[in-house]
Amino acid sequence: MAFANLRKVLISDSLDPCCRKILQDGGLQVVEKQNLSKEELIAELQDCEGLIVRSATKVTADVINAAEKLQVVGRAGTGVDNVDLEAATRKGILVMNTPNGNSLSAAELTCGMIMCLARQIPQATASMKDGKWDRKKFMGTELNGKTLGILGLGRIGREVATRMQSFGMKTVGYDPIISPEVAASFGVQQLPLEEIWPLCDFITVHTPLLPSTTGLLNDSTFAQCKKGVRVVNCARGGIVDEGALLRALQSGQCAGAALDVFTEEPPRDRALVDHENVISCPHLGASTKEAQSRCGEEIAVQFVDMVKGKSLTGVVNAQALTSAFSPHTKPWIGLAEAMGTLMHAWAGSPKGTIQVVTQGTSLKNAGTCLSPAVIVGLLREASKQADVNLVNAKLLVKEAGLNVTTSHNPGVPGEQGSGECLLTVALAGAPYQAVGLVQGTTPMLQMLNGAVFRPEVPLRRGQPLLVFRAQPSDPGMLPTMIGLLAEAGVQLLSYQTSMVSDGEPWHVMGLSSLLPSLETWKQHVLEAFQFCF
């Protein structure tokens, strides 16, 4: 999936002019139209392969399914809540974001919110504008010596931590992915959630909105917090249960809250916004000139680099595709797809478990990107759905009734060939096993069911191969096969045979085109199949 045919991009939200310029300088056609209805968006996408949005455009399943040419959706920002990821993935559409673009702006807003909560600056400003001079009402608290709990220690959480440490705050945090050692490297003591609640004077959330993070702060967790805790949410509406927050504010369990995001935007229920101890903004986390310019620039560069085959970054729904752009991994992706195509041609439409096994130091972590490529080869011929690719392979293989396992064989130290990088694809419990490798940048078939090819058989994209197994003692076999090719009007381009395995070698013929039928062939050989990937 090289995206070489991605030629036209629609920008449907307001972005910095640098975005359009970078795309055009990269050879892409660009259309900019904003405030489109769903119907207008679908109409505009009919001749566009790419779409770039901010948060206003809703890329729903209806839009995705109606956009026949759409290949890539780019989100100029971090959150992809406005893109139906499941629908995009099912259709094989790549979704990208710019995770670095607005990190600093979001972190700075969070820090500003913490300071405003501590000193009630917005409330005091409103009082002054109302003609009042009320010094006693707005008694604040120092940040120095207070404990800040940071839930989510990604880019934004880290930036918040280092800035608030400068105010003398002690920073503790929680992140299921970041290790305690990494957290400690930027001054955060990582603790379990149940230990964080009673410790913190301030809590700020910086997680994506997932089922596991929805309502992370709720009636139960507020009850475990220190009385008078202050809460900041500049991440995603819904991470803090808004009803529970209001009850905590009303009871005094929560002394104040700063909200840049809401479950519904704009919020129709004004109870939180109107509460005197709540500071609120209309989702301004990324609303700085620098962030908008950075996000527009980053997503445009990502599109151009992708089209030119240089690199792929910011991928949300297809990590395997990122690896496909690596110079080392790219030929192995091609081998994996070829092996999957071979396996489908050989075993028919297999059911059960396909085993994908890597061997060799450089392939230690490659299984997760190679197995989707094997699936692409397996399903591409059999699937009656949309094109199978590295984006939707894992989703579609389950629906095809197949289970795919991935493992790594480190080899036995000192054993001959143990350091060789190999890819094995096999159907569990059935006599179908193929082993391949990469020579230079060329995928090669090394073995079929233990029968070794010396030299290996090149697996070149677009090159039809006929594979068959026959008795080694039949001297008339090869002339008969060549005669059958001539009758079908197919030229023989190459021919290789394996070493004898169980008395029967495998033969591989490179052909000018696939044969119309193998029925006649199967009368002369023990087994035969053909494929082209």
Swiss-Prot record:
Under Enzyme Commission nomenclature, its number is: 1.1.1.95
Q: Which GO terms describe its cellular component?
A: myelin sheath
Matching entries from Pfam families are given as:
2-Hacid_dh, 2-Hacid_dh_C, PGDH_inter
| Glycyl lysine isopeptide (Lys-Gly) (interchain with G-Cter in SUMO1) cross-link, renumbered residues | 21
Q: Which residues form the active site?
A: 236, 265, 283 (proton donor)
Presence of keyword Phosphoprotein: yes
Residue numbers bearing the N6-acetyllysine modification? 21, 58
Entry-linked InterPro entries: ASB_dom_sf, D-isomer_2_OHA_DH_cat_dom, D-isomer_DH_CS, D-isomer_DH_CS1, D-isomer_DH_NAD-bd, NAD(P)-bd_dom_sf, PGDH, PGDH_ASB_dom
The record's statement on gene disruption is: Decreased level of free serine, glycine, taurine, GABA, glutamine, and threonine in spinal cord and head. Impaired central nervous system (CNS) with shorter neural tube length and overall growth retardation. Severe atrophy at the thoracic level, particularly in the dorsal spinal cord. Poorly developed dorsal horn and adjacent mantle zone. Neurons fail to develop neurites, particularly commissural axonal fibers.
**Where does the record place the modification Phosphoserine?**
14
Q: Which SUPFAM superfamilies match?
A: Formate/glycerate dehydrogenase catalytic domain-like (SSF52283), NAD(P)-binding Rossmann-fold domains (SSF51735), Serine metabolism enzymes domain (SSF143548)
Source taxon at top rank? Eukaryota
This enzyme catalyses: (2R)-3-phosphoglycerate + NAD(+) = 3-phosphooxypyruvate + NADH + H(+)
Cross-referenced NCBIfam families: PGDH (TIGR01327)
Summary of subunit composition and partner proteins: Homotetramer.
| Family, similarity comment | Belongs to the D-isomer specific 2-hydroxyacid dehydrogenase family.
The name this protein goes by in its record: D-3-phosphoglycerate dehydrogenase
Q: Which organism is it from?
A: Mus musculus
Q: From which lineage does this chain's organism come?
A: Eukaryota, Metazoa, Chordata, Craniata, Vertebrata
